[in-house]
From Swiss-Prot:
Pathway: Amino-acid biosynthesis; L-arginine biosynthesis [regulation]. Belongs to the ArgR family. GO terms for molecular function: arginine binding; DNA binding; DNA-binding transcription factor activity. InterPro entries: Arg_repress, Arg_repress_C, Arg_repress_C_sf, Arg_repress_DNA-bd, WH-like_DNA-bd_sf, WH_DNA-bd_sf. Its main location: cytoplasm. GO terms for biological process: L-arginine biosynthetic process; protein complex oligomerization; regulation of arginine biosynthetic process. Gene3D superfamilies: 3.30.1360.40, Winged helix-like DNA-binding domain superfamily/Winged helix DNA-binding domain. Regulates arginine biosynthesis genes. The lineage of its organism: Bacteria, Bacillati, Actinomycetota, Actinomycetes, Mycobacteriales. Keywords: Amino-acid biosynthesis, Arginine biosynthesis, Cytoplasm, DNA-binding, Repressor, Transcription, Transcription regulation. Residues 182-201 are annotated as: Disordered. It is found in: Cytoplasm. The gene is argR. This is Arginine repressor. GO terms for cellular component: cytoplasm.
Length: 201
C-alpha cells in the first residue's frame, strides 16, 4: 500500500497561527487519504509544523472533520466538509461526487421522481453535500439522514433514471481509477462514457 503524500507546502509562515495550520490540515485531507491522527501529525511534521495530539484533535473538531468508512467496510479516512455554493458545470464538483459515489454508495432504490441512495452509517450528509455541490441539472435537491439520501429528480427525469445515473457514476469512478485513458467526456445523462476505442488492441 502506498503511503499518503502531503499536499504542496505553502511555506512555514502560513502555518504560524491556528488558521494557517488548519488551512494546511484541510489541504492535506483534501489531497491524501489519512487514516489516523498520528499519520496526519507526521505529514504536518514533514512540512515543519509540529503539533500536539490535543491540538490536532481540537483542530479536527473545529474543522468539522469526520472519519468515514467506505462501502467495503475498510479503514476509515478523515474528510472535511466543503463550504461554499455549488458552481454549475464545473467538472471538479462532478468528479468529486463520482469518486465519493464509488467509495460510499451501497445501494439505490427509487419511487416516482425520487431516488434513494444508501451509504455506510454516518456518510449520507457528506455524500449529499457532494451531490448538491455538483449542481446536476437533473436534481432538484437532496435530504440526508444518517445512512440514507433522498434525491428529488427534476422533470422529465424519473427517480429510476436518477438512481441509475448515480450507480453509473460510482461504477465509472472505479474503472477510471484503474484505466483513466478509457473515458471521454459526454453530456449525456450518466456522466462519462467508456471510449470503446480503448478496448481495442
Amino acid at each position: 500500500m502506498s503511503r499518503a503524500k502531503a499536499a504542496p507546502v505553502a511555506g512555514p509562515e502560513v502555518a504560524a497561527n491556528r488558521a494557517g495550520r488548519q488551512a494546511r490540515i484541510v489541504a492535506i485531507l483534501s489531497s491524501a487519504q489519512v487514516r489516523s491522527q498520528n499519520e496526519l501529525a507526521a505529514l504536518l511534521a514533514a512540512e515543519g509544523i509540529e503539533v500536539t495530539q490535543a491540538t490536532l484533535s481540537r483542530d479536527l473538531e473545529e474543522l468539522g472533520a469526520v472519519k468515514l468508512r467506505g462501502a467495503d467496510g475498510g479503514t476509515g479516512i478523515y474528510v472535511v466538509p466543503e463550504d461554499g455554493s455549488p458552481v454549475r458545470g464545473v467538472s471538479g464538483g462532478t468528479d468529486r461526487m463520482a469518486r465519493l459515489l464509488g467509495e460510499l454508495l451501497v445501494s439505490t432504490d427509487d419511487s416516482g421522481n425520487l431516488a434513494v441512495l444508501r451509504t455506510p452509517p454516518g456518510a449520507a450528509h457528506y455524500l449529499a453535500s457532494a451531490i448538491d455541490r455538483a449542481a446536476l441539472p437533473q436534481v432538484v435537491g437532496t435530504i440526508a439522514g444518517d445512512d440514507t439520501i433522498l434525491v428529488v429528480a427534476r422533470e422529465p427525469t424519473t427517480g429510476a433514471q436518477l438512481a441509475g445515473m448515480f450507480e453509473n457514476f460510482g461504477k465509472e469512478s472505479h474503472v477510471r481509477a484503474r484505466h483513466p485513458g478509457l473515458f471521454r467526456r459526454s453530456g449525456h445523462l450518466g456522466g462519462d462514457q467508456l471510449d470503446r476505442q480503448g478496448d481495442r488492441p
